[in-house]
């Protein structure tokens, strides 16, 4: 059994940017950038690309990237669960395949805070300004003094008693969980809040799995539509 397994979920179907895992960004397909970032955290034996698409599998095999073909999955968490059925690990880390700038130190931080003896779900967080607060593409989280998440929403939360923004945090989608947690999540099926805004965190909260959030650098940039490609390429260029 592996101590950790970094799973990179990827799929070709995307309403805003079809085929995005294999889109060329600064000379490499996006999925290859994420793989290279993960390699700065651990050895290749502890990393796998998980997908339902043969095109991605073919690319990975040709380029010596570990990969696994899964059934179709409703979310990245569901896909990690499918991987956990085939590859045993104490801790599974989800590093989203559409983030070619995923921060290596953030992955290391999530791993360091993970505990295979506890049934918990760990995600990252970052403070945000009012623009991101009002952006429904950003998932906002509210947490207590023990960093346990109380609620999440695409709406702007929390607000003060006048309904105004004061301070807030968004979720950073690097996750960690055990096999037991993934099995519990998968066995419950979609909950009502999750079906409303597409945030898998709701299901963990509904079934009583503790969700903890930790501060991350959070300077990645997800590629969701064509305009994001240039942003990422510019950032990559500035790194060299």
What are these regions (language model features)?
Residues 48, 54-112:
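Short phosphate-binding loop-to-helix
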Residues 22, 141-142, 213:
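A structural signal for short hydrophobic beta-strand segments in well-ordered beta-sheet cores
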Residues 74-75, 166-240:
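Conserved alpha/beta core of the MobA/IspD/sugar-nucleotide pyrophosphorylase nucleotidyltransferase superfamily
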Residues 44, 89, 116-119:
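Short, high-confidence coil segments that cap the C-terminus of an alpha-helix
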Residues 6, 47-49, 92, 149, ...:
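Hydrophobic/aromatic residues located in beta-strands of well-ordered beta-sheets
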Residues 2-50:
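N-terminal glycine-rich phosphate-binding loop and ensuing alpha1 helix
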Residues 102-191:
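Conserved core of the sugar-phosphate nucleotidyltransferase
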